[in-house]
């Protein structure tokens, strides 16, 4: 699943020449989708295919509904220092994993099928939390591996802001079962 960051009334960052992040991310997402779809063994889906707003949780829900194997959220940030440049890759932090697990446990609708189709409805709450924590930890490890691969590829075509995968608690990366990067 390819997520073009921002959209609709949420324009994201504004470039020095007046460009909007939402337009840049959508253009990149469409090009990436085409490149992936050109490989007969792969199929890409977009979380949004035009200029409209999709809530952060809705992006993750769509990826899960479409049974995505990976989730890539594309952003084109701006910074107050015009000298700042380069690409970065983020994965969810371990500290974010705990809050993601708590969020999913609190929401009974989403409790089932979070970890490989195993329903947690009939499990002891502590066991369910442990299973979600284990699933989230494994997913974060896979996300960092994916992020390192992407950084290697990006380094061949663009400057890197940081040469390692950074980790933070981005809401859009909090799927406990889909390796996700931003």
Report residues per predicted region:
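Active-site-adjacent mobile loop/cap segments within catalytic or ligand-binding domains
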Residues: 80, 131-182
């Amino acid at each position: 699943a390819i997520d073009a960051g921002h959209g609709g009334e949420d324009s994201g960052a504004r470039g020095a020449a007046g460009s909007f992040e939402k337009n840049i991310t959508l253009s990149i997402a469409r090009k990436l989708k085409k490149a992936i779809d050109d490989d007969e063994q792969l199929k890409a889906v977009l979380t949004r295919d035009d200029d409209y707003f999709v809530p952060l949780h809705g992006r993750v829900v769509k990826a899960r509904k479409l049974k995505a194997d990976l989730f890539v959220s594309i952003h084109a940030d701006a910074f107050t220092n015009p000298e700042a440049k380069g690409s970065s890759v983020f994965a969810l932090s371990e500290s974010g994993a705990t809050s993601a697990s708590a969020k999913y446990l609190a929401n009974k609708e989403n409790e089932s099928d979070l970890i490989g189709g195993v329903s947690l409805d009939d499990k002891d709450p502590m066991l369910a939390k442990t299973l979600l924590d284990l699933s989230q930890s494994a997913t974060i490890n896979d996300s960092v591996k994916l992020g390192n691969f992407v950084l290697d590829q990006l380094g061949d075509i663009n400057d890197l802001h940081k040469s390692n995968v950074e980790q933070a608690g981005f809401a859009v990366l909090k799927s406990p079962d889909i390796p996700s990067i931003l």
